[in-house]
Amino acid sequence: MTDVLDTRGVAHSRTLVDAGRLRIVLTECPELIDAVQRLRYDVFAAEPGFSDQIGDPTTRRDADHVDDFAEHLVAIDDVYGVLGCARLLAPPRAIAAGGWYSATEFDLTEINEIGGSVVEMGRACVAPGHRHGAITALLWAA
């Protein structure tokens, strides 16, 4: 869990879902992206099944160049802070980033023709102890 950040009225953030004390925001806010990168590191580096090379143990961040081009869906609880996230990369942003992140992991040749009409969603995670489905459902609803 991260420090609670009040995103109401924060530049570069837009609330998409307001569910009481839990909000889903779409953001490019550096402070929120930093909190997202810390959550991703905590989830991806600490849990079994992920690569040992995910994130930077020195900074305790899971970050790459795509973060600078993407928009980020962030689940923020008024009490617990950032509890979930997903990274969104629309076609113009993918072009600016040098391509889809997925293309570094998979051969996307077969779906190249639809690339201009899709948004890549990746780096999605929810904090341990909060994986009861509500946060994931709200991220998808946004």
Where are these regions (language model features)?
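Active-site ExK catalytic segment of metal-dependent nucleases
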Residues: 85-91
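Short amphipathic alpha-helix that is part of the acyltransferase structural core
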Residues: 12-83
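Eukaryotic low-complexity, non-globular regulatory regions
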Residues: 1-6
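A broad, low-specificity signal marking well-ordered, structured residues that form hydrophobic/aromatic
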Residues: 22, 86, 119
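Acyl-donor binding region in acyl/amide transferases
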Residues: 91-142
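Conserved GNAT-family N-acetyltransferase fold
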Residues: 73, 86, 124
